[in-house]
């Protein structure tokens, strides 16, 4: 009897078990909530480029609606916090952490559309309405063009900085057969980096390093032609093992193509002859450039599609970190181009303005201002420091345990140490101990907008707008208020005594 046997060349083993990640459901949560809110946060500057110091003119920063606003919110240490009940946790085996359960990002200023552009934009032909191809690209055909950029509303909440991605110049292999020569297109690489405060967003021209990849300095508007435009790396942040960089995010993007141009310059990748029939002169032989581009437009802005000035409640995060603010800090990343109005300011430059309008008598300036307000609802959570939990936290961020005063106790040294009798004299070497090194901030080299909320926590939720909204949706009743009325017992006693007096009088 013939039997069929499978091939013995391959053996499939079960996959290795995935290490468990500590979730917030494994922690103890108390029904103790705190409100914390910032003051009015304002910034003002030039929307296209920074202005350096020159003579008596002060430095003016670049402030654009197409920049990321990354707020680094500093929270107080709950283990050193004045709690209503000192028996909430055991400091020997437990630690307290904050959990963000509610947030509202307030935006001021009216809705508006801000323009960006370039006085010498690389524009050869209007390819949308062109009636004749122009092959002469040797002359300077740059023109003054302005656009209304892509419309974006974005808000990312996490306890570590968000990550962004953009296309940059890659590296060429040393053993490559053909090296990149001068004038050739360089290899590209997708670069992932931290999004800092002031980084430019994707305005509709792509997420790329325009400084390194566009040598003309006129292919995009002024506000990005010497900048790096980053797009949030949602895929990488969503796949993060710990889920610290993005608890949740709000996003709304809108864009359409408004005008269509082609670029002047020598074509690096010529159109193959097999793809067209040669023309008979009249500007069609040789054909003009085939490097096409369009100007973006964010279209209409309306209050019906606003993501800001609304409360959001975090019930279940998309990652493993369900709102725990490790390190007592929170990162809020915001973008709002629906309030991108640029303020135009004019002043009289001449000693006395003429009766008729003369442009040279006036100076024109442009500025952009932004207004933010941050409000949070935090919940108090308790962590039991088991061996697995401490190993997990140490792998994620070892500085957390150091800030909790957990560390290795070194054994006593067995070597013989020197002890001088007379220390403070010129005959003995200096015995001063080396000063303790300050704790290094892991984000000290990055740029963020610091917001200190260490002294702005309040347990009276009903005294703040966001707190009252949270109490309504959570079903929390307000605390009874103190009044000037007499207690009910005294009222009942007095009323009973008056009735007795009336009865005696009637008798």
Curated annotation (Swiss-Prot):
Subcellular localization, as worded in the UniProt entry: Virion; Host nucleus
Coiled-coil blocks: none
Originating gene: L1
Record's keyword annotation contains Signal: no
Pfam families: Late_protein_L1 (PF00500)
Main subcellular localisation: virion
Organism listed in the record: Human papillomavirus 69
Name of the protein: Major capsid protein L1
Compositional bias segments (type: Low complexity): 488-498
């Amino acid at each position: 009897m013939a039997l069929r046997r499978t091939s013995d060349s391959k053996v499939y083993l079960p996959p290795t078990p995935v290490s468990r990640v500590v979730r917030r459901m494994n922690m103890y949560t108390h029904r103790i909530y705190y409100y914390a809110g910032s003051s009015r946060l304002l910034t003002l500057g030039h929307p296209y480029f920074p202005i350096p110091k020159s003579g008596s003119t002060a430095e003016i920063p670049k402030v654009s609606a197409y920049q990321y606003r990354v707020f680094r919110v500093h929270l107080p240490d709950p283990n050193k916090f004045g709690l209503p009940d000192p028996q909430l946790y055991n400091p020997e085996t437990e630690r307290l952490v904050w959990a963000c359960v509610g947030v509202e990002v307030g935006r001021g200023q009216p809705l508006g559309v801000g323009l960006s552009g370039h006085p010498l934009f690389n524009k050869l032909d209007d390819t949308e309405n062109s009636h004749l191809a122009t092959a002469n690209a040797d002359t300077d055909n740059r023109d003054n063009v302005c656009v209304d950029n892509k419309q974006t509303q974005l808000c990312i909440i996490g306890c570590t900085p968000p990550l962004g991605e953009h296309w940059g110049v890659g590296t060429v292999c040393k053993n490559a057969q053909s090296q990149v020569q001068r004038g050739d297109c360089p290899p590209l690489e997708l670069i992932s980096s931290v999004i800092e405060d002031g980084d430019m967003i994707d305005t509709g021209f792509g997420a790329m390093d325009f400084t390194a990849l566009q040598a003309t300095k006129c292919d995009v508007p002024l506000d990005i032609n010497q900048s790096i435009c980053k797009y949030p790396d949602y895929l990488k942040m969503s796949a993060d093992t710990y889920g610290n960089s993005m608890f949740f995010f709000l996003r709304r993007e809108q864009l359409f193509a408004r005008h269509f141009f082609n670029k002047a310059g020598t074509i690096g990748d010529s159109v193959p002859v097999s793809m067209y029939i040669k023309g008979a002169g009249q500007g069609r032989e040789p054909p003009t450039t085939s490097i096409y581009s369009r100007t973006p437009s964010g279209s209409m802005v309306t209050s019906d599609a606003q993501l800001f000035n609304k409360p959001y409640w975090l019930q279940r995060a998309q990652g493993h970190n369900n709102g725990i603010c490790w390190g007592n800090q929170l990162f809020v990343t915001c973008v709002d181009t629906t309030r991108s109005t640029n303020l135009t300011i004019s002043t009289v430059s001449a000693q006395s303005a003429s009766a008729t309008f003369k442009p040279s008598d006036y100076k024109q300036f442009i500025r952009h201002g932004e207004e933010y307000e941050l409000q949070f609802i935090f919940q108090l959570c308790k962590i039991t420091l088991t061996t697995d939990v401490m190993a997990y936290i140490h792998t994620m961020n070892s500085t957390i345990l150091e800030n909790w005063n957990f560390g290795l106790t070194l054994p006593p040294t067995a070597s013989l140490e020197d002890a001088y009798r007379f220390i403070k004299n010129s005959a003995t070497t200096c015995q001063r101990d080396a000063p303790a090194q300050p704790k290094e901030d892991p984000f000290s080299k990055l740029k963020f907008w610091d917001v200190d909320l260490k002294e702005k926590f309040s347990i009276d939720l009903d005294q703040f707008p966001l707190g009252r909204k949270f109490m309504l949706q959570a079903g929390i009743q307000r605390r009874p208020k103190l009044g000037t009325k007499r207690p009910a017992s005294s009222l009942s006693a007095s009323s009973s005594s008056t009735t007795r007096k009336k009865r005696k009088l009637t008798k």
